[in-house]
Amino acid sequence: MITRLSHLFLRTLRDDPADAEVPSHKLLVRAGYVRRIAPGVYSWLPLGLRVLREVERVVREEMNGIGAQEISLPALLPREPYEASNRWTEYGDGLFRLKDRKGGDYLLGPTHEELFALTVKGEYNSYKDFPVTLYQVQTKYRDEERPRAGILRGREFVMKDSYSFDLTDEGLTASYRAHRDAYERIFSRLGVKYVIVSATSGAMGGSASEEFLAESEIGEDTYVRCLESGYAANVEAVKTLAPEAVPFDGLPAAKVHDTPDTPTIATLVDWANGADLGWTVTAADTLKNILVKTRQPGGKWELLGIGVPGDREVDDKRLGASLEPAEFELLTEADFAANPFLVKGYIGPKALQANGVRYLVDPRIVDGTSWITGADEPGKHVVGLVAGRDFTPDGTIEAAEVRDGDPSPDGAGALVAARGIEIGHVFQLGRKYTDVFSVDVLGENGKPVRPTMGSYGVGVSRLVAVIAEQHHDEKGLRWPAEVSPADVHVVIANKDETAREGAEGLAAELDKAGLEVILDDRKASPGVKFKDSELLGVPLVVVVGRGWGEGKVEVRDRFTGESREVAAESALSEIVKAVRG
């Protein structure tokens, strides 16, 4: 097919959009691939839609290749299935909720575990029907609080979600592995650099969970890996290596000290090092106690104390992942006023436990470790408070930040931190949703069997932005051949009618050879055409210009920047060879 730029619905921009923060957003808008309609909501224009459809094609080919079958479920969904699974509440403000004219509650689907489970229940009732894997490529909706980076994090997005149904845990493992392998093929074909990391399941539920993260400095997900062992995990999933417990023998008794004007860790350390305690105190010797309030879905707010070494900050993402499905908030001044035993800047574990406040600590706070922490009175701290002897936590929590150089959970070396963009996620859900909806089938022995599920997502529209993020330069986009909106971009760079006829003829021959061709036949200057060819990012640019009269055309590689002249009579074969390898 030949796409003529003189007819194409396209307007390129020379300047970056004012609201664009990241390269992919800037370039996709400037190149006329997408246009913003509202925060987190974008229109796909002709060239952008082509790239999106190419990504969808690759995803479909690999899903079909593992025996998955495509269906399409509605995006407008009734409340009842999500009420049954408790996700009507668990999703909180992230759901788009609406009512019909009769007052019935509906939502715009963020994901479809419930509906797939009910669909299988309605159609299959025998072990002979299993295993089965179904998938869809569909628009999803999530009410993101802060949509950003164009189509990287939007409120409306295209996602491939698939669901496997097996009768045994071994079957689920096989389905999980098949999807994992298919995802590796998808991302490799798309030219995406990625890592696979251990992850948490969040509101999805289930056990085994891995994320596919595209390597990117602008990614919202922080992950760590151990270069020695290959261990990799999202920071929310990192397990802290706990030290061995320390014997209590010989540990001095805890002692309360006057510590005026020491409400922060820094001021406390300064005081300690001027108090002649007998050793040099660092922030790691202090115990920082953070108070939050938590609420289970449909429940009431409750206080929660969190103890971490003073040299660590609490990571909100890790804390949120540890508390799911509960939500949490920091305490307000009104909360402190209602709980006078909470002395800001001087909170210790004893008052928390004396007042029935649940107290969870970092795994590094083991029995026998001695701490400097709040004494629950203004201007007072206690030195030598020993875990397991002077206070007993209610458990541990993974809430402290993970840092470069921390020991890997597998003990093989140090962790190195990096950032990425989530492009895929695989879960072994187990029977969470088949239990909710009592999905039972007749087993081979005549008894009921409950299928076990897997859930597998790929961010299809997000992948367009990810590819743009990883494949661009200062001039514009550089699409991998697998997803490019065309195979060849032919530029008519001369007003000479002979050159124009030559370009038209070459484009027609390329079309007959089965290539997708963009032909820039506009009445614009060569400079404008060259800039647009670089901005649009088709991997091969063919220039028909002044050299045509000498029987030559120019072939430019958008990825390498290399340019070469080829004879006009051999241009067709040279271009086809370059495109098809």
Curated annotation (Swiss-Prot):
Subcellular localization, as worded in the UniProt entry: Cytoplasm
Protein's UniProt keywords contain NADP: no
GO cellular component terms listed in the entry, alphabetical order: cytosol
Pfam families xref list: HGTP_anticodon, tRNA-synt_2b, tRNA_edit
E.C. number(s) listed in UniProt: 6.1.1.15
Record keywords: Aminoacyl-tRNA synthetase, ATP-binding, Cytoplasm, Ligase, Nucleotide-binding, Protein biosynthesis
Organism domain of life: Bacteria
Reaction(s) the record says it catalyses: tRNA(Pro) + L-proline + ATP = L-prolyl-tRNA(Pro) + AMP + diphosphate
GO BP annotations listed: prolyl-tRNA aminoacylation
Keyword Aminoacyl-tRNA synthetase on entry: yes
A Gene Ontology molecular function term of the record: proline-tRNA ligase activity
Function: Catalyzes the attachment of proline to tRNA(Pro) in a two-step reaction: proline is first activated by ATP to form Pro-AMP and then transferred to the acceptor end of tRNA(Pro). As ProRS can inadvertently accommodate and process non-cognate amino acids such as alanine and cysteine, to avoid such errors it has two additional distinct editing activities against alanine. One activity is designated as 'pretransfer' editing and involves the tRNA(Pro)-independent hydrolysis of activated Ala-AMP.
Comment on protein domains: Consists of three domains: the N-terminal catalytic domain, the editing domain and the C-terminal anticodon-binding domain.
Family: Belongs to the class-II aminoacyl-tRNA synthetase family. ProS type 1 subfamily.
NCBIfam families assigned to the protein according to its UniProt record, in alphabetical order: PRK09194.1 (NF006625), proS_fam_II (TIGR00409)
Subunit-level organization: Homodimer.
Protein known as: Proline--tRNA ligase 1
Annotated source species: Rhodococcus jostii (strain RHA1)
